[in-house]
Amino acid sequence: MILRSFGQKISPLTKKHPISLKKFIYFFIAFNIAALSNGYSETTKETYKQLSIFNEVFNRVKERYVEEVTDKELIEKALNGMLNALDPHSSFMSEDLFKEMQIDTAGAFGGLGIEITMEQGFIKIISPIDDTPAQKAGVESGDFITHLDGQSVVGLSIREAVDIMRGEVGKPITITIVRGMKEPFDIVLKRAIIKIQSVKHKVIDDIGVLRVTTFNEQTTTGLKKIIKELESGETDIKGYVLDLRNNPGGLLDESISVSDLFLEKGEIVSVRGRDKQDVQVYSAKKGDIIKGKPLVVLINQGSASASEIVAGALQDHNRAPILGITSFGKGSVQTIVPIDSGAIRLTIAKYYTPSGDSIQAIGIEPDVVVPQAEIKVLNELFTFRESDYQDALTNETKDPNAKEEEVKNLIDDDYQLFRAIDAVKTLATVQK
């Protein structure tokens, strides 16, 4: 989860008198060592002692490491090591990486199309992004990447891994995947320009299916536009499915805005930092964009962060039942702090659902557990017919079995979505 704070202004002092990272650290260490004899507390003295150790290690590495390394490389790696050791989502970003991140949240960038985290030294895939090389090649949420072009990923930071995976458009990269207990296998992906369409939609049997792939600057606006078009169109939309599967999250304020679209009142999420007194509560404003029509939310193990905020808020207010399987469980908030020569991505808080629960490392539990599966044997037993639904539409110019065939195909292709649509229809019938 990212707070949209990378637009902060750099202080006038920093603008007029930029200090290089190297000079600042040398000055800081020298100052601290000199302060050891000036009557500071034991805790402060211990801190200064550790900084002097850093200085010694830095110089030894410079003098004796097998390959020549620059001061900039060493300092950036030291900063990254410090932040990565805190949690997998904190990191130091060089100036170039900071610019890339700003492009990411705007909705277009180059790469493979996966959202990742680090776990036990390996790259863990939170989710593949729709219509990208990774998704088309069959990469799945929960996969681990152990090697990139034959090189182990152990020891890499997230940003270093991302940097390797990005590159010239069309240039292939081989990723080694571990999936469950199976043997590792290689997938060759060609890098592409990743243009994220954060909101997609389709209408299936008078149910609006709203697919949200990420929470970027375009999400709420796109969702509003689609819903207004559907509500004013010729089809009488009976209800909606909000599909958040394999949505890795994004911007906090967008997740709040999306939740607010479907709620009349009440808390959406609270954000709590280290200071227990410092609690930010975000609440809904009056106005349900679909005016109380049935809504069902779909989640899976690739639904993370902002997706979990939306699912948790709608679940706790009984606005929508949640279908699918338990979500990813990323309940932390990161902020981007611009500094000279880059930025710091730092975990500053955890978020809590309206019921007061943290989903960190636990996730959102669905109300109805529906694993994704290829339903083959069960198809023979299904007695579902389009004509069984109340107010089923007819069309004199088309095959009367067309919708029935569409639903049958949906059972095979996406059983979770089929169940969600069925649930919306049931809720719509109950409301009448």
Where are these regions (language model features)?
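Cleft-lining beta-strand/loop regions that shape enzyme active-site pockets
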Residues: 40-50, 54-71, 124-128, 132-141, ...
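Glycine-biased strand-turn-strand hairpin within the trypsin-fold
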Residues: 43-58, 62-64, 70, 87-113, ...
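Conserved functional hotspot residues or short segments at active or partner-binding sites
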Residues: 350, 355-432
